[in-house]
Every structure is written in C-alpha cells, then in structure tokens.
C-alpha cells in the first residue's frame, strides 16, 4: 500500500483501537526509496506530502517527493553528478530546494508536486548561490543567498529581492531567513561566527533584517521554525554558552522548553504546528543550529517525550536523531540512524486514544 494511504488508514483505525496506559503515542512508517543508501526527510505539509533527499550507491543526492502514489524524483538541471535537496513544501504542493554540481553556483529551485519533472530556477543574474529555506502558501520563498550569506525573499512577480544583513558595517556578518508564514512574517538569524549568532525577524515587502530584540539580541539565539500565528521556536542560551530548545516571544525574550534536552545538555526546537505541538532534537554538541543530534523529541500537552521511546516499532533504527517537521494533523517526520550508521527517515502518525478508555472504563 502506498505510504500516505497507509498512514491515513492507520490513523482511522487508531481512533477505534488505541490506546490506554502504556500504548505508544505514534506509529512508525519508514520513508524509503528503492536502492537508496540513505534517506533524509526535510518537510511535510498538511496534505501529508513529504520532501527530502536520498543518496544513491554513487553518493549522489537526489531531491524526492513522497505522496499517496509513492515516491517521485524531482527534476534537476543537467550535468554530471548533480546533487539535489528538496527543503520545504507548502499546502499547495509547491516545493523549494537546491541543486549543486560543485562547479556552478548552487541553484535555488522551485518545483510543483503535480509536475515533478519541471522546475523554476530562483537565481538572479549575479552568479551567486541561492539556498531557499521555506515557502509559504502564497508561494513566497525565503532563505539566504550569496557569500557571505544575505537574506532574500523571492516572489513570482519580483523575483529574488535582497533583504541584506542586520548590520552591514559588521565585517563578515551573514544572515538568512529560516521560515516564513502565511502572513508574510519572516524569522531567521544573523551571525559572524559560531559564538555570535542572534535571532532575527522581518516582513515580506520590507527588505530589511531586524534583530528580534530583548534577550535575543544579547544572548546567543537562532529562530528556526514558526507556525501560522507567528509563534517562533529555535534555540538560545541564557549563559552565552549552552544552547537549548526555546519558544520566542514577540519582544525577543525566550523561554526554555522544559525537558526538551532529554538527557543531553543542549538541543534545538525545529518546528511548531498550529496546535502548538513542537518537535526538535537533543544533543547537538557545539553546533549553533538545528543539526541532527543524538535524540529526537516532541513537546505536547506540557510534556517532552523522547520519540524513540513512544513509538510502536523501531525496526531499522538504532536511534532517532531529530524530528524536523510536524503538520496540522500532528504527523511528524524526522531522521535516525540504522545499524550501519546510515541516515534513514521516518513518518510518525499519532495514535489517538479511544474515548472508552479515556473516560476511565477498563475491561
């Protein structure tokens, strides 16, 4: 059965068959591509369409889409050993990502799930690399471009518009957007080096990168994900050292997500859905961004859960590394490691509690 049909059917069965105390919170479905040595998921939309990349036996990366019909390779510019990554997908099935042959500058690409064999190049005439990070439901793309990186917004009407840096007078400063929502709010970061990184905010139509304010301007901080209401999550430090998963307030202050580092010292929140459920990673070492860590977690109903311990099956995985996206239905996608230490990916479908048990009846 195709992956997404299976997940949908499973969720329906779960309503009748799950779950009193001790029952797993999620059902695991591996994301696979025949012949792939590794699979790295990047995003899921509310329709359940999923994007990412897979590696073939020759170590070439391919941009890929999964939907109810199975998996589909996304077209890339011609060339030898062109590597592709699909980074984000919106509710309309528009996808953004990159291609790179390590000869030409990195191309930012826009695909449509309905026509995976065609693409639009987002680069302008500057010859600079373009790295999209997100696309909203209006088809507005945000990310970073150039070297050092500068924030940009792309629209079908205006093309690529440079949003610049937070402070152009600072030597070697770089900036990029990490997320954009339907209202046009932008979040991201500026940095000079690993130890000097700060969350930023912007709005589509005003080409500027602005510090988020408050503690985000004085402490290390990085805004990573955002929901439709504009609630941003990411990682930040209260001591200029340890970066932990946080939720940002509009004034730039932030609150640590209790328990989200699990048994690690650090971590990052990566995504938040409109219900306020947050997912991320724990154990990121010295990284200043949401790199794959040692554990993956979900924060729901005031509790952080180690996802590896609340799924019904971990076959094919020795551990989870991160949870990178969550849709409106609470379906989570993320990555882990197999027995050979290759990156593999999963879909976690919520197991809903049966009301007959929720009200206290126990046969």
Predicted regions, residues:
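N-terminal signal peptide c-region/cleavage motif recognized by signal peptidases
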Residues: 16-18
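Residue-level hotspots at or immediately adjacent to binding/recognition sites across diverse folds
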Residues: 21-355, 361
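Bacterial N-terminal signal peptides that target proteins for export
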Residues: 1-8
